[in-house]
Amino acid sequence: MTQWYPVSPTLWQGRDDSAEAADARRLFQTVIRSEDFAPQDWPKQIALMGFACDEGVKRNAGRPGAAGAPDALRKALANMASHNGHERLVDLGNWVAQAPDLEGAQQTLRDAVRRCLCAGMRTLVLGGGHETAFGHGAGVLDAFAQESVGIINLDAHLDLRQTERATSGTPFRQLAQLCDAQRRVFHYACFGVSRAANTRALWREATRRNVTVVEDLDCYNALAQMTQFIARVDKIYLTIDLDVLPVWEMPAVSAPAALGVPLIQILRLIEPVCRSGKLQAADLVEFNPRFDKDGAAARVAARLGWQIAHWWR
């Protein structure tokens, strides 16, 4: 059974510069921490939620540890300066999966996301392995049943694997099957894909599903493809697997990328998504604090979350 917990106030701490000026504030001073999961109380705000789960990573023979990511990322976010957009963040706590019930955890996240979106919030989820994406994406599809939903994944992997059970490598095949069941088009784009990390079978499945695929080698000239994809859909779900980054920027993941796409280029790609007015949901997944020796990788991941909230329109 997946359980919900409010976040400890000790996570949101940092340097206090308020004596300098009224607007010299950091995120730990502007994030609202809710003691209850009550999205109906926070319309037009951004629901910050953790999905503490790495059961999908374990099933996918990866390096476990991502279940500890949500709180590690909160700590990294806490001391960052608060600018426009960050005052909308409401921390709605963590959903903590109980192994081995991945499917139940995904359903719980799906329901929570749907509730947030139907209450007028938008969702920023801190995973968790990339199994987060099925629960998160399904909640978005449920909330916007009459509109076209585009899924944008920044990832070294297509995550269209076919297995008997759900894993961190299957979320977009699961979402494609959900779209089939709901008789809607599966709009999926994956940027940063490593051909060396995806088999021909996965590539063939992407072609069969009409997936927009941009390889890691081509991401430096991919803004036009991103803009075209944004224009085709009504609502957007953005998911960032941190293994899209090169290993020298992001070693703390289950499967570090030998090549990857640098952070500055990832930010350039997601800026038009965030500013489009269509983004309803975003997540950061696969961060593994066990492999982050000095906290540098957490700061890299946190900068992505910081930037999304700042640019979100």
Curated annotation (Swiss-Prot):
Query: What EC class does the entry list?
Result: hydrolase
Question: Reaction(s) catalyzed by this protein?
Answer: N-formimidoyl-L-glutamate + H2O = formamide + L-glutamate
Cofactor annotation remark: Binds 2 manganese ions per subunit.
Specify which residues bind Mn(2+) 2 according to the UniProt entry for this protein: D155, H157, D241, D243
Biological process (GO), any one:
putrescine biosynthetic process from arginine, via agmatine
Tell me the pathway. Amino-acid degradation; L-histidine degradation into L-glutamate; L-glutamate from N-formimidoyl-L-glutamate (hydrolase route): step 1/1
Source domain of life is Bacteria
EC numbers on record: 3.5.3.8
Q: Name one GO molecular function term.
A: formimidoylglutamase activity
Cofactor(s) this protein requires: Mn(2+)
Q: Which SUPFAM superfamilies match?
A: Arginase/deacetylase
Q: Where does Mn(2+) 1 bind?
A: H130, D155, D159, D241
Identify the keywords attached in UniProt to this record, alphabetized: Histidine metabolism, Hydrolase, Manganese, Metal-binding
Function of the molecule? Catalyzes the conversion of N-formimidoyl-L-glutamate to L-glutamate and formamide.
Q: Spell out the family assignment given in the record's similarity comment.
A: Belongs to the arginase family.
List the NCBIfam families: hutG
- What is the protein named? Formimidoylglutamase
Q: Which organism is it from?
A: Salmonella arizonae (strain ATCC BAA-731 / CDC346-86 / RSK2980)
